[in-house]
Amino acid sequence: QAYLEKIEKLRINYPVVSGELNFVFPGCYTTQVETKKANRRLENLLLEAEKFSSLARLSGARDYYPDRDIDESWKIVLRNQFHDILDGSAIGPVYEEVTESYQEAEKRARRALNFSLKTLANLIETRGEGSPLIVFNSLPWERTEPVEARLVFNTPVEAVKILDASGAETPVQLLELKEESGQWTAEVLFMAKNVPSLGYKTYRVLPAKSRGKYKSQLTASSRILENEFIRLTLDPETGWWKSLFDKKTGREFLAASGNVLEAIADEPEGMSAWETGLKEVVEKLGEKGASVKFIEKGPVRATLRVEQLFRSSKFVQDIQLYAGLPRVDIRLWLNWQERNVMVKAAFPVALNRPLATFEIPFGAINRPATGNEVPALKWIDLSDEAGQAGLSLLNDSRYGFDVKDNTMRISLVRGATYPDPEADRGQHQLAYALYPHQGNWKQGLSFRRGLEFNQPLLAEQALI
């Protein structure tokens, strides 16, 4: 304090530096992706645990807050944010220990969250027919989104029916049904509507003799997914997106083939965990052929599966569209075996002189579309110069991006060789999504869409 007071008295006209500092070590945005994924997952999970633990404590149903579990989990997350761990520049054995520590943090965080959700669910009036299912919203605005829930029954079931609080039947998609040790479990998918801010909505689950027949605006074929908002068309030979059409505005959002996975030579001059050496695109996955299969069509979700090969690696994408949701989801599984290559998903956007915006901690920033590898959090956005429309790219676990003119790309995986020669070799899962919107990113609420993609609605089967 004394130092600051003395400086203030000097009244020197200090120079002001406005804007970001130079980007350093862009390879760190994508190296060791499983560590980065665990970091994102734990950050989201702990925020949910804190919110619902506080609500459970304030409800008066208990005088206990799981501070030890939450504190110890945060300590692990923060320790792993040390610059040689989270940035991906440690040696291989470090990440074996880090994986174990994240598992411990997740166990503690989930224990705190689940205990709090059960406490709150048991306070809710749930008398009535069937089994109560409570859907919780961890974000501070009302949401209508898909929910996946695991339901347990003590008697045999052949199908499931879900009713809302008014008794109206809600379209439900049965994903899996199995019997084990005298209990029957059903994995279901349904659209929860108007779940209140930091609140809940109650549904009732009943066994059914057969799967329900519901009206749905969701249609699908071997190359087209369509709902009331979006029509997505794929090339059945390559798996590339040929059209992303906004039905509400009549706008085509792709200027050329989209969701093209580009394998790029990545040959930095040393320090490959830290640095990139991006050169030419050596292959566009799918240009040598791809498998495109129509694997799922229900009243809630339809899915096309795209399988593509690159050298010794395999990429499997489930491209999903939900009834009532203006967003296309991509769930990606990959077996990565390459070195000195980076793979990005590219989206050329049909917008006039677009402005590139990137989410940063506690805000968003505009950057020039020069093609440099830059960091961002849960979303980036391209909106046209007039602010009439835009396209947001959401993600659940990636931090490296680039925008060149009207093409935005997300960095999915790379093959660094130093200090860990086996960095990122093996199996990975991730998710990203495209969200077309009217207006710019603020008017389109892209910041909310990024949070929703990372913190889906939570379902808890309550005690009767």
Name the predicted role of every residue range.
Residues 7-123, 128-129:
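Metal- or metallocofactor-binding catalytic centers and their adjacent structured scaffolds
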Residues 10-12, 17, 107, 114, ...:
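C-terminal (or distal) subdomains of carbohydrate-active enzymes
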Residues 1-7:
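Hydrophobic, mid-to-C-terminal alpha-helical segments
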